[in-house]
């Protein structure tokens, strides 16, 4: 638990700041360059994820858990040192002093319990109220992202359970023998697809499909694709429940669609959080974006608990997958109406 707490503490500190820091390094902040930069940033994240799937299990198998945990720690130390070496070359945005301005939560508390926006402006100042309104406007978009993470995070749970009922994929090795790909190994398809699709989408799709140049459109398209993903998963589950014998390679189809949805969501969400936030609130807004991941996990946990009467064994079914597909579709439709009213504030 101590290790998990320290990891959570470190992740909570770096995640809201690293993407904002990366955005600060872009000189002219052009929309096209920002999109490419955040796509490259997310590509690098998945490169590390891919090697974790590839190297760490082998490290544990041959050298034990001690080295499996030590090697990532050593590389993190090296990365921190390399990052420190470039400290004099980075563009730094110094933190803005509070200067007596009330924070978001104080403004929100006054709005809800002590007389609304007018009273909040009198007690906290116009600039603090303007910041609070801006944050709430962005959060009105973020709230629609929560169901996506409820779907995406199931690749490590319900998809694994489904894959355990499928036939492992055997790939012949040059030196003899086979490499067996089971439900745990098939998850590596996600970072591989991300690294393949991000350059293709950035270079060929975005310049050709003009509507996808708008972040709000990309977010909505990603939501719709997540619904399609679970329709495919539901079909696979329907075949399995009917007694069909299926290779786990069939899961590559929903992984492919979900990865495209993820690219449209995650890279765009980080870009949207950075470009929409005021200068002094960029890390704060990004932290709210990361909070949608937590909320998505809590949502799927609640749905599983209530519909399964607390028994996770009932969580894998065709009906359950269809339920999530419908949820994503309904949210995508609702999001489309909110996105139209959001207005362009970039």
Indicate where each model-derived feature is located.
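Hydrophobic core of transmembrane alpha-helices in multi-pass small-molecule transporters
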Residues: 1-14, 229, 233-264
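Transmembrane alpha-helical cores of Major Facilitator Superfamily
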Residues: 5, 39-47, 188, 192, ...
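Intracellular juxtamembrane helix-capping segments at the cytosolic ends
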Residues: 11-29, 255, 259-277
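Intracellular loop-helix junctions on the cytosolic face of multi-pass helical membrane proteins
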Residues: 28-31, 35, 56-185, 196, ...
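Loop-to-transmembrane helix entry/capping segments in MFS-fold secondary transporters
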Residues: 29-41, 181, 277-288
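A gly/Pro-rich, aromatic-decorated transmembrane alpha-helix motif that marks the paired
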Residues: 46-62, 231-235, 294-309
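Central cavity-lining transmembrane alpha-helices of secondary-active solute carriers
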Residues: 47-52, 188-205, 295-298
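Cytoplasmic membrane-interface "Motif A"-like loop-to-helix N-cap segments
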Residues: 206-224
